[in-house]
């Protein structure tokens, strides 16, 4: 039996399969987006319901920035002393989640009050790196050990309890749930592999298999569009690669710098991709033909 969360999201995906109206515009061409003020740790972009971008690496390592539609950045909130943010995600209620790689935490932030709470702290975590979120609010966290070249995967249930789902992997980094909620993608940066796990009852991870391997360059953050195409940053190559659900490379986009660290979909229609690029210490953006999965979830939650 297919659970109701899969049916609901599947129905939404079907409603979005009709051709999306595309007016005369330039697609797949990156342009500088953000103002100055970021540093080489710029990472973890995520968009809220309005399409506004948030990311880390703005001045102090604790700061999370909000970037206005015209590219101006301002400090939104600072994490507690001793913390450093990386991946950011929003749930369907609008709450923000931040991976804290120095404090071994995942924080939850109320955007309205800017109150920060520790959702989970686990000393077994190396350094929570990036986050993915399922439609029911289950979080997944990649957890690399860069020194040893190994990594773990965590599932964080809706009660804030962390469950180690995989260990002994390579340097786990970018992570994303498929639109139908049945698969979890995770890449290993150093090993240049993307794995896919089956997601079972309660969000538990099942069998895994290699989805895609590359002969060179590394990986960082990843996101899906509404059709299930996976957009992955190629760290060292300076591109974002678009990969179909059948593991076919559909397109590769130059992002104007060699070290893209992560990406998200945003804007009013969900068809603007924002990329954090560490070499130039800025955000770049480009337009695409189909909206992102995050945008689809925002639409479904309205």
Q: What is the role of each PLM region?
A:
Residues 63-65, 105-107, 152-154, 193-195, ...:
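A short loop-to-beta-strand structural motif that recurs across blades of beta-propeller domains
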Residues 262-302:
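Blade-level signature of beta-propeller repeat domains, shared across WD40, Kelch, NHL, RCC1
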Residues 74-78, 117-121, 164-167, 206-212, ...:
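Beta-propeller fold detector
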Residues 55-74:
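Beta-propeller domains
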Residues 67-72, 110-114, 156-160, 199-202, ...:
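Short loop/turn segments that connect beta-strands within beta-propeller blades
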Residues 8-19:
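Bacterial N-terminal signal peptides
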Residues 36-53, 80-96, 100, 105, ...:
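Beta-rich, blade/repeat-based domains predominating
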Residues 24-38, 208:
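A short helix->beta-strand "capping" segment at the edge of beta-propeller domains
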